[in-house]
């Protein structure tokens, strides 16, 4: 029987790692580059911990190492650290270049997405034509509407295919429907059939291979 304390949300798993390995996973401020092969050490250290699975740890680790905060820490002179915060050697230039390229690409994508969602302004030098004011006793005032704020850009989350053993009732998951994953909650697990209630209210039955975490 699965523990009722099992963590299913990636943010909750990251918070657990911040608490369990505070010298390795930094919750706020500048982070430290992680030891190569740290996932294996993490999986072994938490092998008897029923709160997390290897799949969930892999998703959380990928989220942590793809964040801008982490990519900015991969720079010349920085030391990699293990789970206990012990130095494991300096970074190689190849890894620094790769991290900076990933950071630049991610920032450019976010900038392009914001630009696409922001209403286009009138071209410079082409002011809208003004009509001659009408002569009236009391000129009517136009109510100015406040400009709409640009929608908040959500961070890109890398989803991975779930294993049946990683799933539990009331767990938040994403279901592969066409090209775009759809969010929902697991309502029942019957052998290999997973019943998921989508956020739209629709309940569907899928296999574990169609579930993303």
UniProtKB/Swiss-Prot annotation:
Which N-terminal residues, if any, form the signal peptide?
none
Q: Where is this region: Disordered?
A: 105-150
Indicate yes or no for the key word Glycoprotein.
no
Keyword list, A-Z: Chaperone, Cytoplasm, RNA-binding
The record ties this protein, via Pfam families, to: ProQ (PF04352), ProQ_C (PF17516)
Q: What is its main location?
A: cytoplasm
> Which residue windows does the record flag with biased composition (Low complexity)?
115-127
Q: Name one GO biological process term.
A: post-transcriptional regulation of gene expression
Q: Which molecular-function annotations from GO does this UniProt entry contain?
A: RNA strand annealing activity; RNA strand-exchange activity
Function, as annotated: RNA chaperone with significant RNA binding, RNA strand exchange and RNA duplexing activities.
Cited PANTHER family = RNA CHAPERONE PROQ
Q: Return the similarity comment.
A: Belongs to the ProQ family.
What is this protein identified as? RNA chaperone ProQ
Protein species of origin: Shewanella oneidensis (strain ATCC 700550 / JCM 31522 / CIP 106686 / LMG 19005 / NCIMB 14063 / MR-1)
Q: Which gene encodes it?
A: proQ
